[in-house]
Amino acid sequence: MTILAWCIAWVLDFIIGDPQHWPHPVRWIGRLITFVQRIVRRYCPGDKALRIGGGVMWVVVVGVTWGVAWGVLALAQRIHPWFGWSVEVWMIFTTLAGRSLARAAQEVERPLRENDLAESRIKLSWIVGRDTSQLQPAQIYRAVVETVAENTVDGIIAPLFFLFLGGAPLAMAYKAVNTLDSMVGYKHEKYRAIGMVSARMDDVANYLPARLSWLLLGIAAGLCRLSGWRALRIGWRDRYNHSSPNCAWSEACVAGALGIQLGGPNNYFGERVDKPWIGDAQRGISVDDISRTIRLMWVASTLALALFIAARCGLSGVA
């Protein structure tokens, strides 16, 4: 039943994703973060106090998320086993973001194909932190490919990894870790202190999933009739070409698979950030690379699901 729940949740994400107006735990987690952050800022003046308060915030948000998820599942199981199973499926479904990621990328791709640069910049600004107002088409292609490659890890592979380790409650706790990093894990002045713990713990949580993504995306590249060997080679060579210890693993693998170059300089919150280049520019990046990256994401996520199902069966002795 557990494996069936994983599969149904994955299929639901593949088919419908996260409908915009449906209730979603990540939105609730975001409200909790905003509430706790407001309290921390009120009572923790100065960088040192904010770093400590940010650590407390991380513990509170992640702990509450895990506890509520565990409690809701336990209560649902007591009401009826089938109800508990249904709640588990829903909870797992909400931790996966493959369809939402694909849809967001396609929302940028569509106006690009219609030569509507202004609209594509607006749609891109919804999913990236960089300044998109002056980006040219090739820069937009690069931003979308990087976003899909990076979020293949924290939107699909990592939730499945923590689902395998600790069930739906741990997968939900991971989403809290990831949401904390998304909201406060920045290096500029406003968040540097309060978000330090959140940023570092997100690095810890994604350490193994990011490295697993290198292998899965490399295999996916071969299955998609791209260069799997080049994906693995470039992914390994450029794995540290990023300020994050995790992001370049998936980005470099995708760059190698497609034969393009990612990374480079960008503007974040009014500040220029010079990132190392990732991959070799064997050809110029094109709008078609967006759909190719989405396909790589789906194949890699399918491989991840199959891997964790096989591992679960092996550990439980199920043939």
Swiss-Prot record:
Subcellular location: Cell membrane
One Pfam family from the record: CobD_Cbib
Parts of the chain that traverse the membrane: 52-74, 79-101, 155-177, 207-229, 296-318
GO MF annotation list: ABC-type vitamin B12 transporter activity; threonine-phosphate decarboxylase activity
Keywords, sorted A to Z: Cell membrane, Cobalamin biosynthesis, Membrane, Transmembrane, Transmembrane helix
Family from the record: Belongs to the CobD/CbiB family.
Alphabetized HAMAP family for the sequence: CobD_CbiB
Protein name: Cobalamin biosynthesis protein CbiB
Classification lineage: Bacteria, Pseudomonadati, Pseudomonadota, Gammaproteobacteria, Enterobacterales
